[in-house]
Amino acid sequence: MAKGHKSKLQSDALRQYILETSVYPREPESMKELREVTAKHPWNLMRTSADEGQFLNMSLKLINAKNTMEIGVYTDYSLLATALAIPDDGKILAMDINRENYEIGLPKIEKAGVAHRIQFREGPALPVLDQLVEDKKNHGTYDFIFVDADKDNYINYHKRIIDLVKVGGLIGYDNTLWNGSVVGPPDAPMRKYLRYCRDFVLELIKALAVDPRIEICMLPVGDGITLSRRIT
């Protein structure tokens, strides 16, 4: 049985059924190999689940995404899902503070023949976003932006990338169910990092829910992904 990333609305058995019948049989070999490599990494709880990778890949194809951004890549599973979904001349601006983790997945990206679609920037994303926002030529130029990084900056990311994504484009925020802690009482026992980030995730969701520039959909895939579609 697959462990971790259980949907909050599903049993382990049902999730395993989904993986074995519709996810694993269609998973590209390069993504399968990267998933197996990542499972051995000491921080593998940060990984993107296989069903979420499939969801991202199909979502990008549905909107014909070409110019994309990813904030937080870990070992590149979601990044590879994106790179495989966009056209050969498509681009991904990928940002992470840890190049070593990024390079774990790089051989699989190169093997898949999509490394040329990725521009990797090591370091905090906020300064890069500030530079992009400052130049209005960048406004409304991104088809899809995926955020899977420091939860305490999620709201700061949103304030910037909402200008960068085009009208009709999508923003995906990962981990928005945050291990189910979002529905727990304030005094519920939980690990320190869960409690710390929980409030920032809740802050983001409240902000998205009342933002008139977007429409949102929260899905129980992986640890929860909230899609925001810019409408104005």
UniProtKB/Swiss-Prot annotation:
InterPro entries for the chain: Cation-dep_OMT, SAM-dependent_MTases_sf, SAM_O-MeTrfase
Entry superkingdom: Eukaryota
Annotated pathway: Aromatic compound metabolism; phenylpropanoid biosynthesis
Keywords: Lignin biosynthesis, Metal-binding, Methyltransferase, S-adenosyl-L-methionine, Transferase
Residues noted as binding a divalent metal cation in the record, renumbered to the chain: 148, 174-175
Enzyme class, first EC level, given as a word: transferase
MF annotations from Gene Ontology: caffeoyl-CoA O-methyltransferase activity; metal ion binding
GO biological process: lignin biosynthetic process; methylation
Binding site for S-adenosyl-L-methionine: 48, 70, 72-73, 78, 96, 125, 150
Residues annotated to bind substrate: 6, 148, 179
Cofactor(s) for this UniProt protein: a divalent metal cation
Pfam families xref list: Methyltransf_3 (PF01596)
Substrates-to-products reaction catalysed: (E)-caffeoyl-CoA + S-adenosyl-L-methionine = (E)-feruloyl-CoA + S-adenosyl-L-homocysteine + H(+)
Cofactor binding comment, as recorded: Binds 1 divalent metal cation per subunit.
Enzyme Commission number: 2.1.1.104
Similarity remark: Belongs to the class I-like SAM-binding methyltransferase superfamily. Cation-dependent O-methyltransferase family. CCoAMT subfamily.
PANTHER family documented for this protein: CAFFEOYL-COA O-METHYLTRANSFERASE 5, O-METHYLTRANSFERASE-RELATED
Physiological role: Methylates caffeoyl-CoA to feruloyl-CoA and 5-hydroxyferuloyl-CoA to sinapoyl-CoA. Plays a role in the synthesis of feruloylated polysaccharides. Involved in the reinforcement of the plant cell wall. Also involved in the responding to wounding or pathogen challenge by the increased formation of cell wall-bound ferulic acid polymers.
Protein name: Caffeoyl-CoA O-methyltransferase
Annotated source species: Citrus natsudaidai
